[in-house]
Amino acid sequence: MKNVTVKSLAVEMQISVDHLVQQFSNVGFHKTARDYVTQQEKETLLAYLKYELSNTPLTLQRKTRSTLNIASTSGRSKSVQVEVRKKHIYIQPVAHDSILTIKENILPNNTQEVKNNAEASPKTKFILTPKQQSKIAKNNIVNNQNNLIKKSRQISEKAILEAKAAELKHQAEEETRRKVEEKARQIAEEARQFAEHNDSIWMTTPELAEDDTIDDNLSNYHYASIVEDENNRKIENERRTRGNKVSKQKTYRLSEFKKNREEARAVGRSSKSQSKRKSSTLMQVFNKPSQVINRDIVIGEMITVAELANKMAVKGSQIIKKLIQLGVMATINQIIDRETAQLVAEDMGHKVILLRENELEESIMKDRKIDSSVDNAESRAPVVTIMGHVDHGKTSLLDYIRSTKVVASEAGGITQHIGAYHVETDRGMITFLDTPGHAAFTAMRARGARTTDIVVLVVAADNGAMPQTIEAIQHAKAAKVPIVVAVNKIDKKEANPENIKNELTKHGIIPEEWGGQNQFVNISAKYGTGINNLLDAILLQAEVLELKAIRNGIASGIVIESFLDKGRGPVATILVREGTLHHGDMILCGLEYGRVRAMRDEQGRHLSTAGPSVPVEILGLSGVPIAGDEAMVVRDEKKAREVALYRQGKFREGKLARKHSAKLENMFTNISEGGILELNIILKTDVQGSVEAINDALEQLSTEKAKVKIIGSGVGGITETDATLAAASNAILIGFNVRADASARRIIDKENLNIHYYSVIYHLINEVTQAMNGMLTPEYKQDIIGLAEVRNVFSVPKFGLIAGCMVIEGIVKRHNNIRVIRNNIIIYEGELYSLRRFKDDVNEVRNGMECGIGVKNYTDIRTGDIIEVFKLIPIIKSSN
């Protein structure tokens, strides 16, 4: 076999070159890194290494784990994990006699042993020369002898050190004992001398002398205990510095003296001795920080006062004081917003770190990013919103467009009015949105203007611009949406389109023929006049706008309307803005999420896909979304659920914060609200937009005298839960385009609840206003109708005391209220129950006639009194 160098052998054995050279030197070969190694030398080195490994001591480590239950000061047991580690080293014992045997066997006959070992291990075949074998044996014998000598020296030195330590420890204990006894004797001698010096004074009052003796003994024991504790502390410090364990026997601590001291304390315990007694070492003591600690306060979107106080390590009352200084009234459990919490924390000297809690939402938005470059964009249909005042013909116009452009023979027909339609024309598709015209639906009109591309403003030619017409113009201008004016009802005789142009010019709507940018189209929704011209004007405006959208990609849109269907669950109408919505997509819609289980258009036809500008009705959401929420398709269902739950919690916290927020300037107003009457209402409507509109309208009815309180509101029919809540809260049930189910009707009949159904918002608002007026305490006006002067008083057995009177003014009627006036002072107010003229009962007596008047439950009538007769006229009150 070819020889190798020492360096290459070291690489092969995976050790350093220096270490391998040292191993060769131990065997007896002097090598360098560049020298060659023969096969025989390698075998010799291998045998040596094997021999060294056989003499390595075997070390065994054991770990034992256990649990100890330790009783704490509070009475609870505490579990402590204990681990015991044991280490054993196994070394083959080598006796002194065996050294000679090894020497005799190795020196002359080591060649045979090496040969036998080589045969026993066929993998390592080597031959040692006699000189090498003798050298190895001598080295081993010398090493064993040196190890034995070192061990014996270590044992002897350890024994000497332990003996010296024990002697020093004993001397220290004796010295401490001597000093303590000497100090105690000195204190006792001083006390005795002091007692002899004042013996004459103490003997005069034996009881006082006895008490003072006890106090003196206590004082002596107190001083002795201080000295003893000082000595114990010194011994403890010495023990810690030496690192030695103190003996468990504490005889050097004067146990007899401690026993006497405890007995003396039991005999005469006083408040002075108790205050001077040292506190237990187990007692926890809180040290107030010497300087203010500035912390890093992490604040999220919302935080309660208690949480902010915990983060700042201060009391909640300090936070409340600071909030009052800032003009905010808050309780310890109230939620405050991020800005207010930041002001409080920075004012108190802390550093504020604002937490971004919407990172998950941002990650979802990044994950669903699509290629929105202009090259991939395609032309899309315009979204047109029809706006105008109520009864100006918006819905009639939309119905005519649908009836002429939608094929009547399609199966299913129109199944549900969802407020959004798309129609096909010769020049392309148009999507229409219908918005209500009543003032209560302001939010819906604003939402429609934000969603739309073009606004068609319907104005009646016989009525002109009305408040909702002006409001629609304002919404369209705020959204920067072009306006096409449709002058409706031109078939009427009173129609005056030119007057409409003049009125709208005042609000910034100028016709094109007058140099403006707005198209005016004269139409008749009843007869279809000018409808095609209107559609052409809409498509022309869309071409000018150059509307484009990404068709291929993840879909996103906006919720136009939503409601709860009893058979299908939550239903949402979504207008797709970009991308393509597919059946089965996971969609995140405001506070709700879900998979699209079904999708259909405004005619009830099932769809598998929906592109941009197409309104669709989808099923499968976890709840009813809020109209106006943004809907987007996401890839991960888990992330969609987490984002929806986060938004729900954030919405709930914000709602709670708005509900409980009270400014300092409104404090006295809130305190004086006890006398305000409340009209509790539970509102259920057919669609989400109506809930918002009616809620706003009813809240605006609240006044200083009466307040409308919406206990609950929602979408869908009136259920048993709603009826139970109305019975518990004494509320009125209002259904807008919905009805109560059978179980709810049973509770309504049983509890005799007040329920009202409406389909027109005018009627709802008027009747709620009347109900608020009926809640107010009735007021009456006193109308004086007559005066009678008492001329004589006589008694009648049947009626009691009767006053003979002369009517001097007005008329006196039976069963009216009266006042008895004497010397211009009212002395009685009651009811007139008997009125006679001569012997006949009469209902009234006029001016200048005599009559007899019987006053109910009053007998102190005198001659000359004036009886004033008046009636109460109720005053019709208004809640305004």
Swiss-Prot record:
GTP binds at residues 388-395, 434-438, 488-491. One of its GO terms (molecular function) is GTPase activity. It is found in: Cytoplasm. GO terms for cellular component: cytosol. InterPro entries: DNA-bd_dom_put_sf, EF-G-like_DII, EFTu-like_2, IF2_assoc_dom_bac, IF2_II, IF2_N, P-loop_NTPase, Small_GTP-bd. Its main location: cytoplasm. The lineage of its organism: Bacteria, Pseudomonadati, Pseudomonadota, Gammaproteobacteria, Candidatus Palibaumannia. CDD domains: IF2_eIF5B (cd01887), IF2_mtIF2_II (cd03702), mtIF2_IVc (cd03692). Keywords: Cytoplasm, GTP-binding, Initiation factor, Nucleotide-binding, Protein biosynthesis. PROSITE patterns: G_TR_2, IF2. Residues 259-281 are annotated as: Disordered. This is Translation initiation factor IF-2. The keyword Nucleotide-binding applies. Residues 488-491 are annotated as: G4. Belongs to the TRAFAC class translation factor GTPase superfamily. Classic translation factor GTPase family. IF-2 subfamily. It holds the Pfam family GTP_EFTU. Residues 434-437 are annotated as: G3. One of the essential components for the initiation of protein synthesis. Protects formylmethionyl-tRNA from spontaneous hydrolysis and promotes its binding to the 30S ribosomal subunits. Also involved in the hydrolysis of GTP during the formation of the 70S ribosomal complex. Residues 413-417 are annotated as: G2.
